[in-house]
Amino acid sequence: MRHYEIVFMVHPDQSEQVSGMIQRYTDLINAAEGKIHRLEDWGRRQLAYPINKLHKAHYVLMNIEAPQVVIDELETAFRYNDVVIRNMIMRTKDAVTEASPMAAAKEERRDDRREVKKDVAAAPVEAKEDSVEEKSEEAASEE
């Protein structure tokens, strides 16, 4: 079996159908003894240029190992599904399992947001402690 990288873009109005589509495609691959090495749902993203007067699309990336029969079925499924506005199937030499640059960047942003939230949550507590100390010093000096 050969290794493939598949990217398909779904019409942005049909984003809620993406999970069902992914499930159908994974079932198709698994039924033919194929393996899914990486599956990433990138979500709605801005297109580089308009396609069919659309400026956004829902992206999905899959790295799979499957026989040619499955690839042919996926190609026909993409072709006859009006919701899929673009797709690309590329053969690769090896299985790719590490996170893509898109997913890695998304994970970094998520981690950065968590750190900022922790810093913001900790800052008011420190400020309150400082103001309590200042008030107690003022009260001590008045006495």
From Swiss-Prot:
Compositional bias annotation for Basic and acidic residues: 105-143
Pfam families listed in its UniProt record: Ribosomal_S6
GO MF term list: small ribosomal subunit rRNA binding; structural constituent of ribosome
Gene Ontology, cellular component aspect: cytosolic small ribosomal subunit
NCBIfam families (UniProt xref): S6 (TIGR00166)
PANTHER family in alphabetical order: MITOCHONDRIAL 28S RIBOSOMAL PROTEIN S6, SMALL RIBOSOMAL SUBUNIT PROTEIN BS6M
Family from the record: Belongs to the bacterial ribosomal protein bS6 family.
Protein name, UniProt field: Small ribosomal subunit protein bS6
Classification of source organism: Bacteria, Pseudomonadati, Pseudomonadota, Gammaproteobacteria, Alteromonadales
